[in-house]
Amino acid sequence: MKSNYILLGISLLFLNACVEKSSQINSEISILIPENENQQMVDGRLLLIFSKTNEVEPRFQINGGLSTQVIFGMNVENHDRKEKISFDPDAMGFPVESLNQLKTGEYYVQALLHVYETFQLSTGHTVKLPMDNGEGQQWNRSPGNIYSKPVKVRVGEDGPENFDLSLDQIIPEIEEPKDTEWVKHIKFKSEKLSAFWGRDIYLGAHILLPKNFDKHPEAKYPLMIFHGHFPSDFGGFRTTPPDKDLKPEYSDRFSIDGYNIIQQEEAYNFYKRWNDPDFPRFLIIEIQHPTPYYDDSYAVNSANQGPYGDAITHELIPYIEKEYRGIGEGWSRFLYGGSTGGWEALAVQVKYPDEYNGCFAACPDPIDFSSYCLTDIYQDKNAYYYESDFKTLEVPSHRDYLGQITSTVKQDNYLELVLGDKSRSGQQFDIWEATYSPQAEDGYPQRIWDKKTGDINPEVANYWKENYDLRYILERDWDKLGDKLKGKIHIYCGDMDNYYLNNAVYSMESFLESTSDPYYDGEVDYGDRAEHCWNGDQENPNYISRLRYNSMYVPKIMKRIAVSAPAGADLTSWRYKE
């Protein structure tokens, strides 16, 4: 027995020696930021990316799925370009948490600085954030960000070999889309947002005009607002058939070859429907409202992002209706969208019940925070792990229609921590905080949970509940909102939504079906085994129906107008055929 103890002791000593050796990083990684006569000092998030291949640049190989490569991040604060940056050997990484955990082998390495700008907020806070530069808050594509060319590096048992990188490449500006006969583009300075952010802030919109808009100056039009992620231009509309020479591209998401051709076919089909003599004449708009936190604002007022709800509803939309002959009354405005856009459509309808006449919310982001994906922020103590005396099980964040899991809440949040602290990653959980949370003493959003441990803050959770939990708000205020929202709420979701968003829809449906005086008189529907983002089409597969948002709700909208338009409303000027 003694000899066994001796062998065990030797084994443990050897194991400890190996651990100590592997934890030591002797590498020197230096990053040079070339001088710029217009900006000597710089702030931002310095990202270092390792990838096994260079078929596409490493900066484009980071994601939350199984194909992701490795990324590390550190802050750069008031840095003088004359000085090299020694990359922090203790910088947090994803999915490998530290440099000493990198597997041995050869990698392609690239560095990128996500540049921050300084904002003097009307709240009295000074914050440093990445300004959107026309790309929709994408750190690896944002104009003005600087990066290095990829280099090949060897990682040994003691970590990466020493190497230098120069951020001598710059992402160029993005060309603005040009007006066409059908689609117009505007930029609108918001006085409300400019006052909050301490600088000029612009909202954008892409406007699809109805057939023969110029030939009918007497016509005024209802307005359809398509909410969703940042649109570079008006999508899903083309005036010509699919390109004959277009090479088929495979869609991993839908397991379909030639999906790019299908997209062009659907866009052309919509153009033909839009011109059909019997198709109602509407204005459709897609809004650009990126913030320093995300590719859009969630279209509501918030402590951290400012009054985007009021800016869109009371500034932008009346301006568009004036310029493009909208009817300009609440009964003539309709909201729709999926995912983020689904939440926005419902939230805006709830927050501004008299200004809109119906919402069609597909696969909305969590509309009940007791089902914040798979987390109950009111009852759960931790967002990353299920509660158990002995077992450790992470909470999933993404599945396919068969339930196969590809990511967890902890992993998603750790990637965000690498991309940016203080809710500055530009990713999903951080924008929810930027939208729903109160402002912290340092001017950044308060955390709903500790980003490292997952421990939930009940005070912040209660703030979310009172201000942005849509199911709770409807239940709390139904005596005030019920009559204003009757017949206006339509919600759709697949019962195998990839992000478990159907769970919140179930609880919302339970409340809505319990309403009386008045009964909500709307619609909640589910797609069997349908993934994100099913939108209510029971006849076609998801990969088709997601391309038909701009026409699929029109029959329901027309029915709504028929039963709700006030006496004397203009129901004829926009119903011309030619």
Positions of PLM-derived features:
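Positively charged n-region of N-terminal signal peptides that target proteins for export
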Residues: 1-5
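Sec-dependent N-terminal signal peptides
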Residues: 6-10
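C-terminal motif of bacterial Sec signal peptides marking the signal peptidase cleavage site
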Residues: 14-17
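Bacterial Sec-dependent N-terminal signal peptides
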Residues: 19-23
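Contiguous beta-strand segments within globular domains
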Residues: 24-33, 39-47, 202-206, 225
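Short, solvent-exposed linear motifs at loop/edge-of-secondary-structure regions
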Residues: 38-54, 314-315
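Non-catalytic cap/lid and distal C-terminal segments of serine-dependent acyl enzymes
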Residues: 52-92, 97-578
